[in-house]
Amino acid sequence: MRREIIDIKLGSLWFIVGGNFASMRYLGADMFLLRHGQSYFNLHFNQSGVDPGIKDPELTPFGIAQAAAAATTLATSKLTRILVSPYTRALQTVEPIRALYDLPVDVLHEVRERAAFTCDVGSTPDVLATRFPQHDFAHLPRQWWHEGTEPLEATIARANNFRSLMSTRTDSDTTLLVSHWAFLLALTGVSLENAEIMEYDPASPAPPKMAPYA
């Protein structure tokens, strides 16, 4: 397993971060997984431990810089397919990667975060289409996120379905998924930091059952 350290100048500060700034985990694997960059929910919740009550939060300036760094890390990955969750924080994270590769992006609500906090209340497809006109949201249900707290078993089932689907494809090694902490944990058994990239073999067995956290 290798972790890359990336330094980037943001404003007047230098960030030299290993575990949470576009670092990479290698498991000798296939497709690329990327957790979204730091959102305003992450910023406030990590400081206070209290849900700040922000629905569908945007990325912070640091999160935007993390997304740009992730794009740089993935620049030589020869991506042919990009999948992304419909949450704003994921759509903002994917933007510099989409621009780099000039690829259409498939927006999939099946890879969304496990609903447990206010940040997991999403935006309707019409609102998303206004914010991100470069993407197609017409296929999404009006309320594509889970109402209230999603049962852990439902999150695991979504992850298992996605793993099964990707294991049958021949392009998994050039596919990127931009998703969220709990979904990626259910998929891989690994807790990823904001903007951390992981290579993952979708033919791997399902990880041990997640412990409830909310």
Give the residues covered by each predicted segment:
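A generic secondary-structure signal
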Residues: A69-T73, N161-T168
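Basic polycationic patches enriched in arginine
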Residues: R2-R3
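Acidic, low-complexity terminal tails and accessory targeting/binding regions
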Residues: G11-D30, R114-Q134, T170-D173, L185-A214
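Phosphate-handling substructures
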Residues: L43-H44, S48, G53-E58, L100-N160, ...
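Active-site-proximal alpha-helix that buttresses catalytic centers in soluble enzyme cores
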Residues: Y26-D30, L34-V107, A129-R131, I156, ...
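Short, well-ordered beta-to-alpha junction loops that form the rim of enzyme active sites
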Residues: V84-T88, E110-V111, V178-A182
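Glycine-rich phosphate-binding loop signature in dinucleotide/nucleotide-binding domains
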Residues: T76-K78, M166-D173
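Short active-site segment of divalent metal-dependent hydrolases/proteases
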Residues: S39, F183-L184
